[in-house]
């Protein structure tokens, strides 16, 4: 059940069930959509844990808890939140036509992710495809053995993964390494005196969050913090590619600024922001920002008492820890896609559960770490990865997913949606899912394009 699983997650963070907790789940559990994986249970549990963490923060601020309600269908729909976005009545384009599954010479199947231009160009170049068509790429991939092209794509700084069964993945060296990790962890990385939560009329009011993330999981974490009162400043680099449609899904409540860390002025600007930040969330591969001088330990030196949050594809331990990856890739290499279809004809899940749940867990870890800072002091590091979420979902077992829906009934879906007007025009998108009795979640500002705001706190 979702409630039991929510408390299982919280117990991993040393937060036990309390007598004044009020956590209610409505509507049915799995299957909501057509999948054998228990994504409704997992998503609902993660959001339920967030609700209780918000209640804990409110109790620290206002002296009383809150009642939390989670609609399981809304929670499950939130795992495909990007598919519900409309901009001026139109659905933004999100997937490159070359992205997808390709057969290899030895009878395996390779998934290639080509949504970023440099990954697309790299996949064509490395595979030997002469032109940018699916037919040419399929012909090129068919000349490679599966493990060979997987290694070549990864070694070339591109993104792809070989479809594996659950059995093959659990025996893989990285699968073995990840199996030893918790779902998420929070570790103390520095000393600092206790710091009370900032004053404010919302659980995260007054909390300042630097959001240095790009693809879905990290931006989702920032959105959850923003909808509960945090001041979230999304920092992007002007020279890096970005999928604008992600902002229309996850940018609500945030301001967006440019900083170029290749320039000394950019480093100085970010250091200045860190000096006044409560949270520093980053979604780059392990070691990437550290090479620019922003390791968690250095950030904690700049701002004792800060909460650092690291979100990556493959975790912080194991042979693939520095490998590039996205939700769709991790689904395929860990066996989720093979179970959704077959090993020969894999299918990705109807939800991006790894991205969104990783984002929810990052937000949860942030909230728990803020409570620890208020009560114990210290600087803290929260670590979450897509592959750890995949292992968690797999651990919940499978069901007969054929009874699930391709889509929620129109009237039910309409009740989960909201509309906003802003720099992107007229947007339709999902409402916040976690319902709190005292401080309902809302977005204080509409989503805005990258670089719309100055790189400074309000």
Summary of predicted features, one role per range:
Residues 291-339:
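Rossmann-fold NAD(P)-binding glycine/threonine-rich loop
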Residues 219-220, 230, 245, 261, ...:
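Domain-scale recognition of functional cores that engage charged ligands
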Residues 1-239, 267, 275-276, 296-315, ...:
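Acyl-CoA thioester-binding alpha/beta core of soluble enzymes
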Residues 179-180, 250-253, 324-329, 400:
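Short, hinge-like loop/turn segments at secondary-structure boundaries
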Residues 230, 234-261, 269:
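Glycine-rich phosphate-binding loop and adjoining beta1-alpha1-beta2 segment
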Residues 229, 253-254, 277, 326:
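Short, well-ordered alpha-helix to beta-strand connector turns
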Residues 321-338, 343-367:
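Active-site PLP attachment segment
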Residues 210, 255-301:
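A structured beta-alpha segment of the ubiquitous adenosine-cofactor-binding alpha/beta core
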């Amino acid at each position: 059940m979702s409630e039991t699983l929510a408390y299982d997650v919280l117990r991993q963070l040393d937060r036990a069930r309390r007598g004044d907790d009020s956590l209610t789940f409505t509507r049915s559990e799995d299957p909501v959509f057509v999948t054998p994986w228990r994504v409704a249970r997992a998503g609902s549990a993660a959001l339920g844990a967030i609700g209780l963490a918000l209640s804990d923060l409110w109790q620290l601020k206002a002296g009383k808890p809150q009642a939390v309600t989670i609609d399981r269908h809304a929670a499950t729909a939130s795992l495909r939140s990007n598919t519900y976005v409309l901009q001026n009545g139109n659905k933004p384009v999100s997937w490159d036509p070359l992205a997808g599954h390709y057969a290899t010479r030895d009878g395996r199947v390779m998934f290639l992710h080509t949504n970023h231009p440099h990954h697309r160009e790299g996949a064509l170049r490395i595979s030997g495809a002469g032109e940018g068509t699916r037919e040419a790429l399929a012909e090129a991939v068919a000349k490679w053995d599966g493990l060979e092209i997987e290694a070549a794509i990864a070694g070339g700084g591109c993104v792809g993964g070989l479809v594996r069964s659950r059995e093959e993945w659990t025996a893989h060296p990285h699968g073995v390494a990840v199996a030893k990790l918790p779902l998420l962890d929070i570790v103390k990385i520095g000393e600092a005196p206790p710091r009370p939560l900032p004053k404010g009329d919302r659980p995260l009011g007054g909390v300042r969050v630097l959001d240095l993330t790009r693809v879905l999981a990290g931006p989702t974490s920032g959105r959850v913090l923003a909808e509960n009162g945090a001041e979230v400043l999304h920092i992007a680099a002007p020279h890096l590619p970005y999928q604008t449609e992600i902002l229309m899904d996850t940018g609500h409540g945030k301001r967006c600024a440019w900083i170029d860390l290749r320039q000394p002025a950019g480093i100085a600007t970010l250091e200045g922001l860190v000096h006044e930040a409560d949270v520093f969330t980053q979604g780059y591969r392990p070691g990437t920002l550290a090479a620019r001088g922003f390791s968690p330990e250095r950030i904690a030196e700049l701002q004792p008492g800060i909460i650092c949050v690291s979100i990556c594809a493959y975790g912080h331990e194991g042979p693939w820890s520095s490998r590039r990856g996205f939700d769709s890739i991790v689904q395929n290499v860990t066996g989720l896609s093979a179970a959704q279809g077959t090993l020969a004809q894999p299918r990705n899940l109807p939800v991006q559960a790894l991205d969104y749940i990783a984002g929810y867990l990052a937000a949860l870890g942030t909230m728990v770490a803020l409570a620890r800072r208020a009560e114990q002091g210290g600087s803290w590091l929260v670590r979450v990865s897509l592959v750890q979420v995949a292992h968690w979902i797999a651990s919940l077992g499978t069901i007969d997913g054929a009874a699930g829906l391709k889509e929620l009934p129109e009237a039910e879906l309409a009740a989960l949606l909201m509309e906003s007007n802003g720099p992107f025009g007229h947007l339709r998108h999902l409402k916040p899912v976690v319902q709190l009795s005292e401080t309902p979640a809302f977005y204080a500002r509409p989503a805005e394009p990258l670089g719309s705001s100055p790189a400074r706190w309000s």
